């Protein structure tokens, strides 16, 4: 079994060694320009067109949970990968736990009003504030995939009312499920904290705009953990300035790194991190990939395959 690996920043030698230990019958090599030798599987992140074009691969593994970048490249260069070759994304590989940590810590930060206390501290004001109740702090999750399910599970332990909005109905215990555009308003009207975990598709680009934000309760919060292109940043800033939103926590942006001139840097109600909410953890990724390749070789059912038509 031949496996080729490409990632512009990862330590290729480590990955090659780890994969060969996990799959003793495989020969793994780092792909370099000009390498046209046969391969059965490819592990990639932002691969050049020529790496995959013309290859008769059994499967391609994308070294991350998001596949929007490679799907966009495939649309622009259909010769890059035959449509019959399955494409897999990393379903969890430690990302679920990281998303849980991030979401829970931020929801609790707002629930306990630590943002307000930081503002008071900056003014040297000693002023206890009224507490929020859990009943008035409903959390709504947009996107009900693997990571959305993990986040809902972790928040459930804290007793917050939970709801999710997705393409298909979910039957998660203790979580109200809303489906499609026709139920979006009802989902938003009672959502105090909006967590975005949607996939990046043509239907979801720019979805968090003034029209959507206006349907949230006054004083709501937005936590974006998905993709920067989901948010119309000017509309978000306008909602913060008007008081419609009380705060926003952003891990992703329409342009990364975020330009120095962006007003998001200086807005007092915006907190941010540099796209680190959930990163690929190599050991967990190796375990998932080696297990999935073994299942594919045996003809067993697998999970994590990308639906190219849906975009995730």
From Swiss-Prot:
One of its GO terms (molecular function) is NAD binding. InterPro entries: D-isomer_DH_NAD-bd, GhrA_Enterobacterales, NAD(P)-bd_dom_sf. Keywords: Cytoplasm, NAD, NADP, Oxidoreductase. Coiled coil: none annotated. GO terms for cellular component: cytoplasm. It comes from the Bacteria. CDD domains: GDH_like_2. The keyword Lyase does not apply. Its EC number is 1.1.1.79, 1.1.1.81. The keyword NAD applies. It catalyses: glycolate + NADP(+) = glyoxylate + NADPH + H(+); (R)-glycerate + NAD(+) = 3-hydroxypyruvate + NADH + H(+); (R)-glycerate + NADP(+) = 3-hydroxypyruvate + NADPH + H(+). The active site is at residues 227, 275. It is an enzyme of class 1 (oxidoreductase). It is found in: Cytoplasm. Catalyzes the NADPH-dependent reduction of glyoxylate and hydroxypyruvate into glycolate and glycerate, respectively. Belongs to the D-isomer specific 2-hydroxyacid dehydrogenase family. GhrA subfamily. This is Glyoxylate/hydroxypyruvate reductase A. It comes from Salmonella choleraesuis (strain SC-B67). The lineage of its organism: Bacteria, Pseudomonadati, Pseudomonadota, Gammaproteobacteria, Enterobacterales.
